[in-house]
Design a protein with these regions (language model features):
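Juxtamembrane "helix-exit" motif on the non-cytosolic side of transmembrane helices
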Residues: 24-28, 55-64, 118-126
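Membrane-interface helix-boundary motifs at transmembrane edges
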Residues: 26-39, 92-100, 158-162
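Alpha-helical transmembrane segments in multipass membrane proteins, preferentially the mid-helix core
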Residues: 79-94, 149-153
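Small-residue-rich transmembrane alpha-helices that serve as helix-helix interface/gating elements
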Residues: 10-14, 131-147
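Hydrophobic alpha-helical membrane segments
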Residues: 76, 80-84, 101-121, 140-143
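Hydrophobic transmembrane alpha-helical segments in integral membrane proteins
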Residues: 1-18
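Non-cytosolic membrane-interface motifs at loop->transmembrane helix junctions
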Residues: 64-75, 101, 126-138
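A generic, lipid-embedded transmembrane alpha helix
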Residues: 44-59
Length: 162
């Protein structure tokens, strides 16, 4: 199996694994808890997306990554982390704008994923990623599943509870 196939297989298994965890434990918990508390829980992991800045650090990567991938991925993750922090703060403060901030963060963060995955597959090879290889195989599946859960909550539960 070539290295790109290994990467894609790893990401797929990660998404399936986090999906199983979501179905068995997270979704039942979300249904049993207040809407804003659930959104806060799902938003917290995204605050740590600043780790994507490591795509810009040679030494963490085996060689400098193609800037057509590294730059938008790194700064897209930083923006997503800041937006997640704003949304989380609004949720914890029970701001009347908290759901709006969650929508903004979730749309921007999900769009960043689409761009980063597309650019990553196009311009970066797994062997160049060095230690950052663990971002797409561990963090991305968790964050992808949590984005989907946030969209699910915003679309289905928000109508019932606000």
């Amino acid at each position: 199996m070539n290295q790109t196939a290994i990467l894609l297989t790893s990401i797929t298994i990660g998404v399936v694994g986090w999906g199983i965890i979501a179905k068995l434990w997270v979704i039942p918990w979300l249904k049993d808890n207040p809407f804003h508390k659930g959104l806060a829980l799902l938003t917290i992991p995204h605050v740590f997306r600043y780790i994507g800045l490591s795509f810009l650090i040679t030494g963490v990567t085996n060689s400098p990554l193609d800037p057509r991938f590294a730059t938008p991925a790194a700064y897209g993750d930083l923006i997503a982390a800041i937006l997640a922090l704003i949304a989380l703060t609004a949720l914890l403060a029970k701001s009347r704008y908290s759901v709006l901030f969650v929508w903004i963060f979730n749309i921007a963060g999900f769009a960043d994923f689409l761009v980063a995955v597309t650019q990553g597959l196009r311009y970066t090879h797994p062997e160049e990623m060095g230690a950052t290889y663990f971002i797409p195989i561990l963090a991305v599946p968790l964050l992808f599943v949590s984005h989907l859960l946030i969209f699910w909550m915003l679309v289905t539960r928000n109508r019932k509870e606000t």
